[in-house]
């Protein structure tokens, strides 16, 4: 008799995706982040659902409803901090996942890569809207500053901003719609993640060597299921350590002050995972130019497959490109640091240099170095 998991219409999909899936035998721990992102998403949806049961999306009660969750709801504090710090873990995994894709040339799978970019944008939008919900000072002013950037769009900008706000400032209408979108977006992200996997399974996984692994495949289960479980346990250990020992480490103290439109905080800054993009935005004196640079800092990923000039797929055997990749990593860390600093000398200049370097590495230096490496292969 044929096994039910191979014949049942639903079980067959699960079987072909997670059990009998042929996987390369040499994929490293850098390939763990996809499953970790799935775990993060499930965790965020679950904790978010329980938070939504007690949260009220009204400017008068939003802040106190979050306080109520932390003080009065059974284990509300741990659910709230798991959700807040879960977002940080989500973005750590996202950055590692994208970095792995850049390093090993996974962007050659164009459909998978492009869906991944859409996923990144959707996750960033969700996180931004979620940050507004507690209705603290940084929530309010962050929402005001970031939505206001759209006013830089010529002709329709001002109307667009007021349409998003639902009025002439960030107010009750804005909070209500942000809550609605923040609730629905994770489910859209889950659907997109399935599309992401669908496209990936059309081609099969890449591997560290960058050469085809068709001649040496192993079943996903038990080899990679057990490997993923180890990754998940490590992720949960880090998350729970953060939640239980220093839940406010990555947050902003200003967000413990209720939103006040009459009092601007001295330094308006987003959560740490947006600081690199925020630094790029601030390093350009022109408003429209800054907004374009902000969008392009992520959208540039869509150009990466078209800028691939190397004869080899990954960077495993390309030491010069490796140096550039780690320079890019250091540059992004520098931008993250600058994004959290006040706008004054020398931070302005450092931010501008780091921003120029970011675009130069991806658009000019990497393709050039790849051509040089191709020529070195001839020697």
UniProtKB/Swiss-Prot annotation:
Compartments it resides in: Mitochondrion inner membrane
Residues annotated for a ubiquinone binding in this entry: 201
Major place of residence: mitochondrion
Cofactor note: Binds 2 heme b groups non-covalently.
GO terms of biological process kind: mitochondrial electron transport, ubiquinol to cytochrome c
One Pfam family named in its UniProt record: Cytochrome_B
Recorded topology in the membrane: Multi-pass membrane protein
Membrane spanning residue stretches: 33-53, 77-98, 113-133, 178-198, 226-246, 288-308, 320-340, 347-367
Keyword field: Electron transport, Heme, Iron, Membrane, Metal-binding, Mitochondrion, Mitochondrion inner membrane, Respiratory chain, Transmembrane, Transmembrane helix, Transport, Ubiquinone
List of residues binding heme b b562: 83, 182
Keyword Cell division applies: no
UniProt-annotated binding residues for heme b b566: 97, 196
GO molecular function terms attached to this record: metal ion binding; ubiquinol-cytochrome-c reductase activity
A GO cellular-component term linked to this record: mitochondrial inner membrane
Cofactor(s) for this UniProt protein: heme b
Position of the signal peptide: none
Note: Heme 1 (or BL or b562) is low-potential and absorbs at about 562 nm, and heme 2 (or BH or b566) is high-potential and absorbs at about 566 nm.
Function: Component of the ubiquinol-cytochrome c reductase complex (complex III or cytochrome b-c1 complex) that is part of the mitochondrial respiratory chain. The b-c1 complex mediates electron transfer from ubiquinol to cytochrome c. Contributes to the generation of a proton gradient across the mitochondrial membrane that is then used for ATP synthesis.
PANTHER family membership: CYTOCHROME B
Annotated family: Belongs to the cytochrome b family.
Subunit structure: The cytochrome bc1 complex contains 11 subunits: 3 respiratory subunits (MT-CYB, CYC1 and UQCRFS1), 2 core proteins (UQCRC1 and UQCRC2) and 6 low-molecular weight proteins (UQCRH/QCR6, UQCRB/QCR7, UQCRQ/QCR8, UQCR10/QCR9, UQCR11/QCR10 and a cleavage product of UQCRFS1). This cytochrome bc1 complex then forms a dimer.
Name of the protein in question: Cytochrome b
């Amino acid at each position: 008799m044929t096994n039910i998991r191979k014949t049942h219409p639903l079980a067959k999909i699960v079987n072909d995706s997670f059990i009998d899936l042929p996987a390369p035998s040499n994929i490293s721990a850098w390939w763990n982040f996809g499953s970790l992102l799935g775990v993060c998403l499930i965790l965020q949806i679950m904790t978010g659902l329980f938070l939504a049961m007690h949260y009220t999306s009204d400017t008068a009660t939003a802040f106190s409803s979050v306080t109520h969750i932390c003080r009065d709801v059974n284990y509300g504090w741990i659910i709230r901090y798991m959700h807040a710090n879960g977002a940080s873990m989500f973005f750590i995994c996202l950055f590692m996942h994208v970095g792995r894709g850049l390093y090993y040339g996974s962007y050659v799978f164009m459909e998978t890569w492009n869906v991944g970019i859409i996923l990144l944008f959707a996750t960033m939008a969700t996180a931004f809207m979620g940050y507004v919900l507690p209705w603290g000072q940084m929530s309010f002013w962050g929402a005001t500053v970031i939505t206001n950037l759209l006013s830089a769009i010529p002709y329709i900008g001002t109307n667009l901003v007021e349409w998003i706000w639902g009025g002439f400032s960030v107010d009750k209408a804005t909070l209500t719609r942000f809550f609605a979108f923040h609730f629905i977006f994770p489910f859209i992200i889950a659907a997109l993640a399935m599309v992401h996997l669908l496209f990936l399974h059309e081609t099969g996984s890449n591997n560290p060597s960058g050469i085809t692994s068709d001649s040496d495949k192993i079943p996903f289960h038990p080899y990679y299921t057990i490997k993923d479980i180890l990754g998940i346990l490590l992720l949960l250990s880090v998350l729970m350590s953060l939640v239980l020992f220093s839940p406010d480490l990555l947050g902003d103290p200003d967000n413990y002050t209720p939103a006040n439109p009459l009092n601007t905080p001295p330094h308006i800054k987003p959560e740490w995972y947006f600081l690199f993009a925020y630094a790029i935005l601030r390093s350009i004196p022109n408003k429209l130019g800054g907004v374009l640079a902000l969008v392009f800092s992520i959208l540039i990923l869509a150009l990466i497959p078209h800028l691939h000039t190397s004869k080899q797929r990954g960077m495993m055997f390309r030491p010069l490109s490796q140096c550039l990749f780690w320079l890019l990593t250091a540059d992004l860390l520098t931008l993250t640091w600058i994004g959290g600093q006040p706008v004054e000398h020398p931070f302005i200049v450092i931010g501008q240099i780091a921003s120029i370097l970011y675009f130069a590495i991806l658009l000019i230096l990497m393709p050039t170095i790849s051509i040089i490496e191709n020529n070195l292969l001839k020697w």
